[in-house]
Amino acid sequence: MEVISTNTNGSTIFKNGAIPMNGYQNGTSKHQNGHQNGTSEHRNGHQNGISEHQNGHKNGTSEHQNGHQNGTSEQQNGTISHDNGNELQLLGSSNSIKPGWFSEFSALWPGEAFSLKVEKLLFQGKSDYQDVMLFESATYGKVLTLDGAIQHTENGGFPYTEMIVHLPLGSIPNPKKVLIIGGGIGFTLFEMLRYPSIEKIDIVEIDDVVVDVSRKFFPYLAANFNDPRVTLVLGDGAAFVKAAQAGYYDAIIVDSSDPIGPAKDLFERPFFEAVAKALRPGGVVCTQAESIWLHMHIIKQIIANCRQVFKGSVNYAWTTVPTYPTGVIGYMLCSTEGPEVDFKNPINPIDKETTQVKSKLAPLKFYNFDIHKAAFILPSFARSMIES
């Protein structure tokens, strides 16, 4: 493994009950413009709820400012309460619901929230780019949040990860060179290593704290960073793509945050143009693309941008993820001009033999040939809007 660092180490705030990572000092950090690009399994950029941990002797509150009614982010900090009564402050979050629960709020899904019971807080800190927290939940194992938004759950996030990898890579023959924008925890890399044809994987993660959390709490994932085919780059994902050699990659996977605030650029035409340039003829890209239940206006704009850039094919797929808003998430799958790519009919499906014998990984939990094909079948309301 080669590790290339293009950003500075983040400083981290630790309060009572948090578990500090080695090498970080107490202090504050400032958000930089690079936050929008190359984050790990991201859905951040929200006004997020945060819980209070366990029996919480001191209930933390958050006072909503008047701007909250207009979707602005003027909110007070939320807290987590611990059994010993100490409070752990999570900066930039909105109010919690009750002791022992993590709750996520966002202007992207107004009028609703998602909550998980917290068994144990494992880590909380602030990097140069975001608040990072990891806790053990009662239902889904370890839960990673960034800026108070759930990014991945150990026992419930596999549909998202398997689909964002196998929908594109299962649609092209023998992928060899792949780029992951984000992926600092390692779930996406874990799935990608199922393909014996792969010779090189570049991972661009902007936040070194996310990588450190992986090494400490997900060692079975972080071990894959040591694979000789893997280069881990700590830096800006959009800048990396822009500077990439033309026609170099067979596939690019974009694990981005939601297309609001600083992450908006990752869903607009200039970024997609850079991605298309970095792909070979007939190369493919897959990026997360929100929920059909809440974000059709966003999805239509993403599709319009992709249709202007990608001259091969442009497709929308979706799947179920229990810990994401509305329980579903979508994907944009596009190909550059060149050899035809039919995303709806995979030609390189991962089968049982490839998964368990050649790659020596555990069987897939969600993805299969039928799920791949079904992901492109949309409800009537979504199909009419997307195809219009």
From Swiss-Prot:
InterPro entries, A to Z: PABS, PABS_CS, Putrescine_N-MeTfrase, SAM-dependent_MTases_sf, Spermi_synthase, Spermidine_synt_N, Spermidine_synt_N_sf
EC numbers on record: 2.1.1.53
Gene Ontology terms: biological process: alkaloid metabolic process; methylation; nicotine biosynthetic process; response to insect; response to jasmonic acid; response to wounding; spermidine biosynthetic process
Keywords, comma-separated and alphabetical: Alkaloid metabolism, Methyltransferase, Polyamine biosynthesis, S-adenosyl-L-methionine, Transferase
GO cellular component, one term: cytosol
Disordered: annotated segments: 1-88
GO function terms (MF aspect): putrescine N-methyltransferase activity; spermidine synthase activity
Domain PABS: 99-336
Involved pathway(s): Alkaloid biosynthesis; nicotine biosynthesis
Substrates-to-products reaction catalysed: putrescine + S-adenosyl-L-methionine = N-methylputrescine + S-adenosyl-L-homocysteine + H(+)
Comp. bias (Polar residues): 1-14, 23-39, 46-88
Induction: Triggered by jasmonic acid (MeJA); this induction is repressed by 2-chloroethylphosphonic acid (ethephon), an ethylene precursor, that can by alleviated by 1-methylcyclopropene (1-MCP), a competitive inhibitor of ethylene receptors. Accumulates upon wounding and feeding by the specialist herbivore Manduca sexta; these induction is dramatically amplified by a pretreatment with 1-MCP.
Organs and tissues of expression: Mainly expressed in roots.
Gene3D superfamilies reported for this sequence: Spermidine synthase, tetramerisation domain, Vaccinia Virus protein VP39
Residues binding S-adenosyl-L-methionine, per UniProt: Q130, E205, D236, G237, Y324
Pfam family, one: Spermine_synth
Catalytic residues of the enzyme: D255 (proton acceptor)
CDD domains tied to this protein: AdoMet_MTases
Task performed by this protein: Involved in the biosynthesis of pyridine alkaloid natural products, leading mainly to the production of anabasine, anatabine, nicotine and nornicotine, effective deterrents against herbivores with antiparasitic and pesticide properties (neurotoxins); nornicotine serves as the precursor in the synthesis of the carcinogen compound N'-nitrosonornicotine (NNN). Methyltransferase that mediates the conversion of putrescine to N-methylputrescine.
Similarity comment: family membership: Belongs to the class I-like SAM-binding methyltransferase superfamily. Spermidine/spermine synthase family.
Name of the featured protein: Putrescine N-methyltransferase 1
Source organism (scientific name): Nicotiana attenuata
Gene name in the database record: PMT1
